[in-house]
Regions:
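Secondary-structure transition motif
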Residues: 1-125
């Protein structure tokens, strides 16, 4: 993954919609906010987001070309799996969301079709 591919998504505080972009934490005295910044040709736009919803892009896309983020739930190999960051492996892994849990390194998805069917955050809220 290239440095320009590093991006995040999170839910905006004002309208609860997902927004994608660069992750920015502003610690200016009383203005401490967690924001997602969107940089476009016309300039930058910052959106205050819920810090508990921040998810990192994995560098992968599903069969339909949708970006795969941490916390997404995918349909893969006749089962549902959640994308999770595993500190001990320094990698994104898949964890089964059904009765059995297991870990599979996300790199296996590079050669297999999968579909994003939801995400942990929307499922919980």
């Amino acid at each position: 993954m290239k440095i320009e591919d590093i991006k995040f998504k999170a839910k905006r505080l004002d309208n609860k919609e997902w927004v994608e972009g660069s992750f920015v934490v502003m610690n200016i005295a009383a203005l401490s906010k967690t924001t997602i910044g969107i940089v476009a040709a016309g300039g930058a736009t910052l959106h205050e987001v819920d810090p508990s919803t921040v998810c990192q892009f994995t560098g992968l896309t599903d069969y339909d070309g949708k970006d795969l983020y941490e916390g997404d739930i995918i349909s893969f190999s006749d089962s549902y799996n959640q994308v999770v960051w595993e500190d001990d492996l320094c990698a994104f892994v898949l964890v089964g969301v059904e009765s059995h849990s297991y870990y599979v390194h996300c790199d296996i998805l590079k050669n297999c079709p999968f579909y994003i069917v939801g995400n942990k955050i929307d499922k919980e809220k």
